[in-house]
């Protein structure tokens, strides 16, 4: 059991002074207001509720540091960044996604984020493309291992662009038809079964018909 004393804490009904939070197994078990600190308390100035990361692509954590560069021709742009992102996306399998997402989620938790909306479009494991929902399970494992609260938002990605009705080769691991996507969404709702939330994402006007 751990106790934290906050000089000020933001509770559901607003700010309170001299608040003690008692934690059991990593969760807040008891909240007391108007109490003096004692020697066993960890003392903090302010405590606020955990934040929510409202838009995450966890696999891109592995891209950090690989795109902070300039070409000699100075022609870098979002589109050159996207090519490197696609290269990474095509190489991430389920085992790698679990490890990358676990690291990203642990970093979120240590920074004060206690929930995450994961906008996910790596729907197929490149090493085992016929194994259904391996990448979904990888994210669930990462969230469970880290302890973050997950909202899974599968993203529909149908085509390469307005004038190209088919996905490009480097998009095939995550491109889906609408009926495939709706089936994935239904399976995700059943798989999470109350342990998290499931949303629906459409990538963009460019990528969705």
Predicted regions and their residues:
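Active-site gating loops and adjacent loop-to-helix segments of metal-dependent hydrolytic enzymes
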Residues: 62-97, 126-131, 159-179
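Metal-coordinating catalytic core of metallo-dependent amide/deamination hydrolases
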Residues: 126-209
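Divalent metal-coordination and catalytic microenvironments
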Residues: 7, 26, 44, 55, ...
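N-terminal metal-binding scaffold of metallo-dependent hydrolase/deaminase domains
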Residues: 1-36, 46-47
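A cross-family signal for N-terminal binding/gating loops and helix N-caps
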Residues: 40
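Histidine-centered catalytic micro-motifs
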Residues: 49-61
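Hydrophobic alpha-helical hairpins/lids featuring a short glycine-rich hinge
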Residues: 88-130, 136
